[in-house]
């Protein structure tokens, strides 16, 4: 993966309330704001549109797009983050209408992953996810992304480079898959060398639920624990011996 020089992204959060989501739009945007902050963006506003159905071409209605464009100019925004997953056509049409970079929740999460991954396996997995995401969202976006600059989504493989040579992307994905299989094979060998009788306990929970904090309290592992979404991306396993002499392996998933 490659990282660009850090830029401060000023973003507006956008959601469509079509009545199908079990969570209300404001709650979804609250979490999206946490994600944006974790990705080092500055949230300067939010906007929700109630629609019977999401517009397949532009995500938002034409009137709301005009309102959003004026709001973005007033707030000096540099980008828009939509709570929903957008199609390549929706992204292209919104970027053309707003003259701003348009991002989805998925792109923000992948950007956070690119920043947080520390292990070789984690970095390979994140780059694979970025390449696959970008490959599926290339349609007509090379020019727009080049014009709209860096920020969120520019950690990892760049859009302009991806647009130039799809075959190289496929080759890179193939190479990364081979690397990942080799890493997994090495990990399997390490597992076989461990005492197979030792119980393994996995700490499972939503992001920022406190898994790393609990692992540190139980084992003294010293794993990074912050009040941020996806603060820990890589898996950590530590051995613990109880007062009775029993041994356990705790894994921060």
Can you describe what each PLM-predicted range is?
Residues 4-11, 141-253:
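Conserved G1/Walker A P-loop phosphate-binding module
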Residues 32, 131, 169:
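A residue-level signal for conserved active-site and pocket-lining positions in enzyme catalytic cores
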Residues 125, 129-147:
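Interdomain "pre-motor" coupling segment immediately N-terminal to P-loop NTPase/helicase cores
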Residues 1-111:
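N-terminal accessory targeting/assembly segments
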Residues 108-129:
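Short alpha-helix plus adjacent loop in nuclease-associated cores
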């Amino acid at each position: 993966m490659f990282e660009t020089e850090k830029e401060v992204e000023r973003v507006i959060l956008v959601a469509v309330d079509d009545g199908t989501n079990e969570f209300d739009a404001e709650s979804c945007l609250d979490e999206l704001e946490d994600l944006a902050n974790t990705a080092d963006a500055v949230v300067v506003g939010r906007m929700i549109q109630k629609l019977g159905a999401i517009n397949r071409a532009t995500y938002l209605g034409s009137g709301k797009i005009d309102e959003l464009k004026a709001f973005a100019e007033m707030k000096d925004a540099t980008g828009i983050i939509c709570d929903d997953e957008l199609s390549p056509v929706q992204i292209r049409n919104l970027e053309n209408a707003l003259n701003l970079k348009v991002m989805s929740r998925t792109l923000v999460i992948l950007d956070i992953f690119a920043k947080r991954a520390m292990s070789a396996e984690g970095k390979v997995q994140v780059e694979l996810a970025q390449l696959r995401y970008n490959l599926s969202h290339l349609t007509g976006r090379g020019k727009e992304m080049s014009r709209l600059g860096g920020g969120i989504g520019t950690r990892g493989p760049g859009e302009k480079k991806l647009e130039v040579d799809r075959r190289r992307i496929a080759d890179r994905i193939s190479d990364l898959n081979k690397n990942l299989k080799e890493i997994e094979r090495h990990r399997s060998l390490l597992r076989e060398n461990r005492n197979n009788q030792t119980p393994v306990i996995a700490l499972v929970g939503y992001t920022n639920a406190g898994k790393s904090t609990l692992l540190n309290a139980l084992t003294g592992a010293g794993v990074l624990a912050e009040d941020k979404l996806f603060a820990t991306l890589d898996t950590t396993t530590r051995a613990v011996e109880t007062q009775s002499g029993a041994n356990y392996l705790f894994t921060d998933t």
